[in-house]
Amino acid sequence: MDSTYIGSYGRLRVYQTEFFSRQQIDQMLSMTDPKDVSAFLYNGPYREDYDSLSAVFKDPDLTEMAINRHMVRNNRLVLFAIPPLAKNAVVAYLSKWDIENIKTVISAKFLGHGIREAEPFLVSFRDIPLGIMSGTLTNEDYRNMINLPNIEAILNYLARFGYGTYMMQFLEDYRKTGDISPMLYSLDRYYYMNLLSALKYYRGDEAPVLNYVRSDIDRQNIVTMLKGKVLKIPFERMSSGIIDGGNIGVNRLREIYSSQDAVSVADALKQYYDLEEPKKKYMETGDLYHFDIAIRNIIARRFLDTMSMLPLSLDSLFYFILRSEIERHNLRTIYLSKVNGMPREITESLLITEMM
C-alpha cells in the first residue's frame, strides 16, 4: 500500500456509488422508448452532462455526448487526485481517447465529412477532448485537422504530437491503395507501445494493470485475426493490424491463423481464452462481435476484482477508470439499441456485465 494514494482513493470510493447497478441496467433494458432511457440518465448522475450540452445538441446526439462527457468527468477525478508516480501510467492509458478521436477525424476526412458530422463522435468534456487533460490534443486541434484539405495534411499536423510521425510510414501505401486501415492500425500499435513502456517502469504494484493491458492486446489481435480469416486475408497482409506485447506472441498468432477458418481459430485459442459460447453464437448468426464482447467479459472477470481489492495502489485508479469505461459502453449500447429498435436479447448480448 502507498499512502500517497489515500486522497485519491477516498474521493474515488465516494464516486463509485454512482455507477449503475445491474438492477438499474435491467430497468433501462426493459424500456422501449429511447426518451425513457435519456430521462433515466438525466434523473441520475448524468444531469450535469445533459444540462451542459442541451443548448447545442438534441437527441440522439445529446445522450451519446452526455454519456461520453460523464466518463471524461470521471477520468478528471482520477487525473486531479493522482499521485506523481502514477501520472505517466494513467496519462498513457487515457491517451486512448486521443487515438479514438484521431481515428474519427481521419475517417471523417476520408469520407468527406466536416466537423459537424464528426463532433458527436469525439469524446470530449465542455468542448475539450480528454487529451487536453493529458497535455496533448485540444478541441481546436481537432477542428483544425478536420478543416485541412486531405489526410496527408492531417498527418503533418499530428507530427508535432508524435502520432503523425509514426503514421507517416504508411503514407506511401495509402497513396497507392487508398486504404486507410494500416494507418489506423498503426495508431493502436503506437498507443500500446507507449502504455506498456509507462507501466513497465512503474514501482511494482502494477501487475494486475499490466496483465489487463496485455490481455486487451490479445483481444485486439484476436478480433483482427478473426476478421482476416473471414475475409480470407493472408497473415502477412494483415500483420499491420497485429500488436506486439500481448500474452500471445506474434509467432504463436501466426500459427493459430493457419487454422482453417474462424471457428478453428477460436478452438486453437482455448488455452488462452475459452470462446466456446461466442463460437456457438457466431456459427448461428455469422456475427463476429460475439467474440469481442466475450473476451472483454473474460478480461473484466480476471482482473477487475483483483484491482478493486488493492485500495492504495495504481490498481485502485485503474479500477475506477475501467468501471467508467464499461458503464459508457453499456449505456451507449442500451440507448442506441432503443433508438434503432433492437430486440432486448441482442442488446444484452452486447453488454459487458462482469462488474455490474
From Swiss-Prot:
GO CC entries: plasma membrane; proton-transporting V-type ATPase, V0 domain
Role this protein plays: Component of the A-type ATP synthase that produces ATP from ADP in the presence of a proton gradient across the membrane.
Membrane topology: Peripheral membrane protein
Superkingdom in the source lineage: Archaea
Stated name of the protein: A-type ATP synthase subunit C
Species annotation: Thermoplasma acidophilum (strain ATCC 25905 / DSM 1728 / JCM 9062 / NBRC 15155 / AMRC-C165)
Location in the cell: Cell membrane
UniProt keywords, alphabetically: ATP synthesis, Cell membrane, Hydrogen ion transport, Ion transport, Membrane, Transport
Family from the record: Belongs to the V-ATPase V0D/AC39 subunit family.
InterPro entries reported in the protein's UniProt record: ATPase_csu/dsu_sf (IPR036079), ATPase_V0-cplx_csu (IPR014272), ATPase_V0-cplx_csu/dsu (IPR002843), V-ATPase_V0D/AC39_subunit (IPR050873), V-type_ATPase_csu/dsu (IPR035067), V-type_ATPase_csu/dsu_dom_3 (IPR044911)
